[in-house]
Amino acid sequence: MGESGPVVIDPRRHDAVLFGVGDALGSALASQLGQIGVGTAAIAADDPAAAADRLRVRPGRCVVVAGDPAAVEAARAAGFALVIGLAPDGRDGDGLRAAGADAVIAELEQITVRTGDRRMSQLPDASQALTGGADGLAGRHPAVFFDFDGTLSDIVDDPDAARPVAGATAALTRLAARCPVAVLSGRDLADVTKRVGVPGIWYAGSHGFELTAPDGSHHQNDDAAAAIPVLAQAAGRLSDELGTIPGVVVEHKRFGVAVHYRNAARDRVGEVAAAVRAAGRHDALRVTTGREVIELRPDLDWDKGKTLHWVIEHLRRSGSGALTPVYLGDDITDEDAFDAVRGGPVQGVPILVRHNDDGDRATAALFALDSPARAAEFTERLADQLERGEG
């Protein structure tokens, strides 16, 4: 096989780019990365993780660019987030792919760098979104979407122990009486519906592959359903391979396989990530990451952002009129929804619930809240505002 198309360095997902090729540290690409706060370093072909250690960044949030199949193979085994093979004039592209490269390019200019985002610490408090102004909600009719884990619920060591924070369900109930409300989760649909337990709202599970409307009608992505047997097989193999590592939990969901490593030793995380990425390559499944989790799901162009657009369009066709989408989320998978909220026909309000798991990473959100407890308070204040007729 030859080269791939353009690949993207995304500061929301990547803290550093490590080069195993020539004078790349002096390239225009390296300069552009420095301008947006993404670190760079050179690697040794046999130990790319050492460069990540020097920069104090995790391999799971780093990119490796290398022209040596041995370096590509070492980066893949260490669990790096993105491994790019560099094959000038198409030389050894097949060898780089066989070694585990996610993409093969002929020149560094094929790499695109995402710009324009702000760091989490730079965002204003979401209380400002309750006022007027171009980005505010005063005088507008919102449709409010929530992630669950890390947004309505605190992140806990045992995913099965997650529950909405105090006041969250009462605030959701009040809000749902005044505007459309949806919970979009990576959990199974039945799981998140039971945990939240608020009637009369939208629930989407598995990042939107399956959802129920307030009237109880069920919708699913039939293309994703075709991958259910493959996901089951992958879950079984990963349980056998990783289940003996202390602190690792392999969660088989209807439309995904989530491997949690929050409680695992840090020196085993690369091994876990490498195993999941290898399973994704073997079974042609998409690999996504989150807060101390790496997941397999159907390799389809569908995410929380597209789910949000689908729900908004459904509401529009049902006569809801012009709605301003609001999305509250904390994780990398929520960035798709932030992009959708900002890029839709109506400028919406993307709100990040801050955390420390990924450092001060970049985000497409425009506002922030400091915890799920603050998210519950924001929801209550928005319900108050709508009850007073100020929405």
From Swiss-Prot:
The protein's required cofactors: Mg(2+)
List of residues binding Mg(2+): D147, D149, D330
Which residues are substrate-binding?
A: D147, F148, D149
Q: Which GO terms describe its molecular function?
A: metal ion binding; trehalose-phosphatase activity
The domain of life for this entry's organism is Bacteria
What UniProt keywords apply to this chain's record, in alphabetical order? Hydrolase, Magnesium, Metal-binding
- What is the E.C. number? 3.1.3.12
Q: Which SUPFAM superfamilies match?
A: HAD-like
Question: InterPro entries, alphabetically?
Answer: HAD-like_sf, HAD-SF_hydro_IIB, HAD_sf, OTSB-like, Trehalose_PPase
Q: Which biological processes are named by the entry's GO terms?
A: trehalose biosynthetic process
The active site of this protein is located at: D147 (nucleophile)
Q: Does the keyword Magnesium apply?
A: yes
Question: Is Metal-binding one of the keywords?
Answer: yes
Q: What catalytic reaction does the record list?
A: alpha,alpha-trehalose 6-phosphate + H2O = alpha,alpha-trehalose + phosphate
According to UniProt, this protein's pathway is: Glycan biosynthesis; trehalose biosynthesis
The text of the family note is:
Belongs to the trehalose phosphatase family.
What the protein does comes down to: Removes the phosphate from trehalose 6-phosphate to produce free trehalose.
This one is known as Trehalose-phosphate phosphatase
Q: Which organism is it from?
A: Mycobacterium avium (strain 104)
